[in-house]
Amino acid sequence: VDNGSYGTIRMHQEREYPGRTSGSDLFNPDFAAFARAFGWNGEFVDRTEDFEPALQRFVKAGTPTLLHLKLDTDVITTRTTLGAIRAAAQRA
């Protein structure tokens, strides 16, 4: 799962210094391409509706598989977003 950031660090930065983050963004390589280069199945998924079909293909394949899931950076946990943390910190 790839949200393009050091999530916990980013969360603390937004809480303590809203809107002023530093060094928490990641620019990851194409991990699915790496997997394919080594003979594995590899697929990049960045839309929710594409996840289940990709997962089903790989379960049926029965071979080593890497599924690179790209999430929105703002989705930091299942309960909150970076935007909500930033807004709460700005109100405080």
Q: Which residues does each PLM region occupy?
A:
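Thiamine diphosphate
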Residues: 1-92
